[in-house]
């Protein structure tokens, strides 16, 4: 499935196999836009597929996030001003579930601490401008991480994202990437 993806900020070291994408992050790679301290960074690694309508994207992510701001997960992007990224991130001295929504300005939503866990599954469903972000620790049970709005657009890009704003060299493995028509499930449905 990775053969339909194209880079924004291609990392120096990466390998796409039929079922797995391996990345070693470059130094100072990150995505933020007009944050609380005015920071703007558009240097993160994003391997996105183009889609023109609603979808469900899913991926398994393995990353050892150990420095402030390290992250790996899924991104949905319209342009530099309109995007969401969600996944494993290092915040407050521990790996956590994180999401960042950017509608001109970036926010940060911190989810559950992950402890020593370095792997999880992410799923993003986009239907008529509504984003449903789910995270799973086992690939079977999918609790809600975030429900948000993103402008309706003629084209989106969706796929793996990662970055290390304070360092380089984080190894990330993405697998089980899929892209399909949007799942039609109620918010309480954890499947």
What residue ranges belong to the model's regions?
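Extracellular glycan-recognition regions
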Residues: 1-191
């Amino acid at each position: 499935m990775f053969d339909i993806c194209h880079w924004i900020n291609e990392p120096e070291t990466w390998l796409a196999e039929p079922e797995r994408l391996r990345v070693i992050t470059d130094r100072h790679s990150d995505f933020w836009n007009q944050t609380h301290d005015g920071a703007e960074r558009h240097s993160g690694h994003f391997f996105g597929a183009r889609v023109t309508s609603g979808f469900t994207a899913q991926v398994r992510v393995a990353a050892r996030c150990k420095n402030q701001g390290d992250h790996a997960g899924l991104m949905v992007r319209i342009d530099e001003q309109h995007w969401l990224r969600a996944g494993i991130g290092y915040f407050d001295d521990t790996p956590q579930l994180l999401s960042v929504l950017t509608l001109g300005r970036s926010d940060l939503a911190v989810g559950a601490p992950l402890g020593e866990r370095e792997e999880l599954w992410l799923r993003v469903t986009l239907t008529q401008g509504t984003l449903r972000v789910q995270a799973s620790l086992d690939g079977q049970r999918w609790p809600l991480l975030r429900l948000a709005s993103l402008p309706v657009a003629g084209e989106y890009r969706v796929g793996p994202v990662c970055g290390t704003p304070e360092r380089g060299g984080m190894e990330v493995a993405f697998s089980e990437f899929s892209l399909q028509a949007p799942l039609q499930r109620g918010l309480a449905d954890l499947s």
